[in-house]
């Protein structure tokens, strides 16, 4: 079954962006490449229970098993040794990416307290967007009673756009609620 957001992109957004930016070839039109969801464990890296809960929460939110990221080198100031788990990460592509973005845009972001839209300034200069989420409770899949601690996560939306303007137009067309 094709995702709702993917169908919307193929049927309406693609022709609109092609006309707006004057592309001759349909493959020049910016599209979503991947979405990465990352959570750094911080001081919880010493705690195996925190790692397990982060793994299950990210798996529940994204629908895909996260990979544990490990420290590349020891840093005494942070009490980290080489090979210690320092975070969890998921890379979403194709159907799961569209499903996650659909839930993020239409369900999770509107549930943030005092939400007025996301910052339009978080583009990286190449059309990719990064978003920080402060608490995992905004996702309807997470049960309030099962979490041990409120933790945030970073969501990076990677597009094939060449400029921030193209990336912003693509995400706005997909329904991303940018602050005016």
Swiss-Prot record:
InterPro entries: Ribosomal_uL5 (IPR002132), Ribosomal_uL5_bac-type (IPR020930), Ribosomal_uL5_C (IPR031309), Ribosomal_uL5_CS (IPR020929), Ribosomal_uL5_dom_sf (IPR022803), Ribosomal_uL5_N (IPR031310)
Gene Ontology biological process terms, A to Z: translation
Record's keyword terms, sorted: Ribonucleoprotein, Ribosomal protein, RNA-binding, rRNA-binding, tRNA-binding
GO molecular function: RNA binding; rRNA binding; structural constituent of ribosome; tRNA binding
Top-level taxon of the source organism: Bacteria
Database matches in Pfam families: Ribosomal_L5, Ribosomal_L5_C
Any one of the GO CC terms: cytosolic large ribosomal subunit
Physiological role: This is one of the proteins that bind and probably mediate the attachment of the 5S RNA into the large ribosomal subunit, where it forms part of the central protuberance. In the 70S ribosome it contacts protein S13 of the 30S subunit (bridge B1b), connecting the 2 subunits; this bridge is implicated in subunit movement. Contacts the P site tRNA; the 5S rRNA and some of its associated proteins might help stabilize positioning of ribosome-bound tRNAs.
Homology family: Belongs to the universal ribosomal protein uL5 family.
SUBUNIT field: Part of the 50S ribosomal subunit; part of the 5S rRNA/L5/L18/L25 subcomplex. Contacts the 5S rRNA and the P site tRNA. Forms a bridge to the 30S subunit in the 70S ribosome.
NCBIfam families membership: PRK00010.1
Protein name: Large ribosomal subunit protein uL5
């Amino acid at each position: 079954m094709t995702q709702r957001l993917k169908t919307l992109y193929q049927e309406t957004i693609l022709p609109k962006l092609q006309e707006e930016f004057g592309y001759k070839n349909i493959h020049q039109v910016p599209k979503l490449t991947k979405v990465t969801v990352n959570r750094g464990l911080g001081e919880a890296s010493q705690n195996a229970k925190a790692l397990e809960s982060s793994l299950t929460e990210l798996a529940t939110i994204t629908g895909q098993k996260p990979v544990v990221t490990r420290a590349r080198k020891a840093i005494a100031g942070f009490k980290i040794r080489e090979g210690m788990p320092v975070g969890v990460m998921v890379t979403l592509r194709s159907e799961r990416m569209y499903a996650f973005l659909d839930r993020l845009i239409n369900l999770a972001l509107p549930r943030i307290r005092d939400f007025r839209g996301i910052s339009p300034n978080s583009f990286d200069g190449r059309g990719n967007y990064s978003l920080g989420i402060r608490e995992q409770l905004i996702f309807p899949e997470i049960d309030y009673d099962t979490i041990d601690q409120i933790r945030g996560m970073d969501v990076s939306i990677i597009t094939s756009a060449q400029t921030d303007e193209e990336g912003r137009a693509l995400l706005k067309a997909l329904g991303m609620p940018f602050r005016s």
